[in-house]
């Protein structure tokens, strides 16, 4: 390790010990040495013994800085790996850090755009509107039309810091995976790899711009969701410019009530927006925490959601969507056999899974949920319970489903915060049933025909050539198969000859032994010679 890495590692260990995180080390013969070393560091005692372990972990990550804050946020979404007393406090981590100098931000933007800001913008505010671990946001006006915009710029020198901390995370994850068999279930290296990908994706604002453009297109002219316009002429890897919006933060309940917002409709529209993104578009905003969601103050009787920060999105393929919809419907119909079979059919659990045992396990976990009224049942926790049960049957981690479950928990939490009586099932069931109905029957056939017809017509002129190639390949394949079959038959014949000669040779050798005992040496020698010759011919036949 380099001196800088050792210094950073000491800082990380120091913070962990000051928050008593050595409690996370399991009782194991391999952890005795670290625990003994910990006792020798008498000056690094747990200074927060009055706090719960989950809260101490949250505070430690917050003190270690941006990379670790985001890592904690990701850990909070992996409830299939971490228990509630760890995941719940981590969900409260706030990605807010001190801003860097606004003049430096202005200089960075000018370097990326290749000219002074005054060329395109007026009233650039040196004071940032918001500051997070990866980027910060400033406001300005477009010189051409006076339109209010926001300029998002990646923090300077953030990449080396991320690379250094990720490298240390990998080192620790590999040590933990090798040294502690109990920790392998958590797949520490895979968790770090998933986090690294998420973090590096957020460093490229072109990706966020593309996501925002796609989401805006999907909800164009929609009364339910508005996505600010991205000004692509001013976007690159480290700078993104978009329309500035004025709204009420979704967590500001007092402000929403003061504006006369229809809270019931707003909550129901949040559910509708989520299921529309998932099942209609197969493309959903996967970071819908309250800081990224606002409400349009205009027309409060017909409220509209506003979605910001599209850095993290999720996608589902058609098979995942179908299995997910059928899982929800089967669960709420209490058809646990169907739920178990769907997990096997989808490939989420191994094909050799005992469906009967899996059904019993799902029933034991899910049946108590129905002790509550349907309106109190959490969709997100239903998914969580299903995934946790499936993990016992070797279900592989499905990243797209983890993102979906996290987003569903956000949307559901926001919806019930806005309108506690929100019946998520009554809101979602018609949507799911309608979507499933569109996947089967004449309407689904016509839809599939409509989608594929242009491709078929495009390929029709190539059909004769494709048919000729297929026939030619078929003839060549038949010839190769015939040659293989003839070779197989010849091999079988040779093996049969070899077996026959081996048997004759063995018989003659036995006979030679009998004739020797009866003083018939000439016959014995001749018989043995012919027997050995038969064995040699048999060996030759097998070799061929």
UniProtKB/Swiss-Prot annotation:
It is an enzyme of class 2 (transferase). Its EC number is 2.7.-.-. It is found in: Cell inner membrane. GO terms for cellular component: plasma membrane. The keyword Zinc-finger does not apply. Keywords: ATP-binding, Cell inner membrane, Cell membrane, Kinase, Membrane, Nucleotide-binding, Transferase, Transmembrane, Transmembrane helix, Ubiquinone biosynthesis. SUPFAM superfamilies: Protein kinase-like (PK-like). The chain crosses the membrane at residues 496-516, 519-539. The keyword rRNA processing does not apply. Is probably a protein kinase regulator of UbiI activity which is involved in aerobic coenzyme Q (ubiquinone) biosynthesis. This is Probable protein kinase UbiB. It comes from Vibrio cholerae serotype O1 (strain ATCC 39315 / El Tor Inaba N16961). The gene is ubiB.
């Amino acid at each position: 390790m380099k001196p800088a890495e050792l210094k950073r590692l000491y800082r990380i260990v120091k913070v962990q010990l000051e928050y008593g995180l050595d409690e996370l080390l399991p009782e194991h013969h391999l952890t005795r040495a670290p625990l003994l070393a910990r006792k020798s560091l008498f000056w690094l005692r747990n200074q927060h013994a009055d706090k719960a372990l989950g809260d101490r972990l949250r505070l430690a990550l917050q003190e270690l800085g941006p990379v670790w804050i985001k890592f904690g946020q990701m850990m909070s979404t992996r409830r299939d790996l971490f228990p509630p007393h760890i995941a719940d406090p981590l969900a409260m981590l706030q990605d807010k850090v001190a801003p860097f100098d606004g003049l430096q931000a202005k200089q960075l933007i000018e370097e990326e755009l290749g000219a002074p800001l005054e060329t395109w913008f007026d009233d650039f505010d040196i004071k940032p509107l918001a500051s997070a671990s990866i980027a910060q946001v400033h406001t300005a006006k477009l010189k051409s039309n006076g339109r209010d915009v926001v300029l998002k710029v990646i923090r300077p020198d953030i990449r080396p810091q991320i690379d250094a901390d990720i490298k240390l995370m990998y080192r620790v994850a590999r040590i933990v995976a090798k040294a502690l068999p109990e920790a392998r279930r958590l797949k520490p290296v895979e968790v770090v790899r998933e986090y690294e990908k998420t973090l590096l994706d957020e460093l490229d604002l072109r990706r966020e711009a593309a996501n925002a453009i796609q989401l805006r297109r999907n909800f164009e002219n929609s009364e339910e969701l508005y996505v600010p316009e991205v000004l692509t002429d001013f976007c690159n890897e480290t700078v993104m410019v978009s329309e500035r919006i004025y709204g009420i933060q979704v967590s500001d309940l007092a402000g929403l009530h003061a504006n006369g917002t229809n809270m019931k409709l707003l909550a129901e529209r949040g559910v509708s927006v989520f299921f529309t993104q998932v099942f209609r578009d197969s493309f959903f905003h996967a970071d819908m925490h309250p800081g990224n969601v606002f409400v349009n103050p205009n027309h409060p009787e017909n409220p509209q959601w506003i979605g910001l920060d599209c850095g993290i999105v999720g996608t589902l393929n058609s098979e995942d969507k179908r299995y997910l919809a059928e899982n929800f419907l089967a669960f709420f119909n209490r058809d646990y056999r169907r739920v178990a079979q769907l997990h096997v059919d989808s490939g989420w659990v191994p094909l050799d899974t005992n469906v009967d045992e899996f059904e019993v396990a799902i029933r034991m976990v899910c049946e108590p949920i129905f002790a509550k009224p349907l309106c109190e049942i959490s969709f997100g926790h239903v998914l969580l319970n299903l995934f946790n049960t499936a993990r016992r049957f070797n279900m592989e981690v499905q990243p797209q489903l983890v993102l979906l479950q996290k987003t569903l928990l956000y949307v559901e939490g926001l919806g019930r915060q806005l309108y506690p009586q929100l019946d998520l099932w009554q809101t979602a069931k018609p949507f799911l049933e309608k979507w499933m109905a569109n996947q089967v029957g004449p309407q689904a056939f016509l839809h599939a025909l409509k989608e594929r017809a242009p491709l078929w017509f495009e390929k029709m002129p190539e059909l004769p050539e494709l048919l000729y190639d297929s026939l030619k390949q078929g003839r060549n394949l038949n010839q190769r198969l015939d040659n293989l079959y003839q070779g197989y038959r010849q091999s079988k014949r040779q093996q049969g000859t070899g077996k026959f000669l081996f048997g004759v040779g063995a018989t003659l050798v036995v006979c030679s032994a009998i004739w020797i005992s009866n003083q018939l040496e000439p016959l014995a020698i001749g018989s043995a010679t012919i027997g050995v010759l038969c064995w040699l011919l048999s060996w030759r036949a097998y070799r061929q």
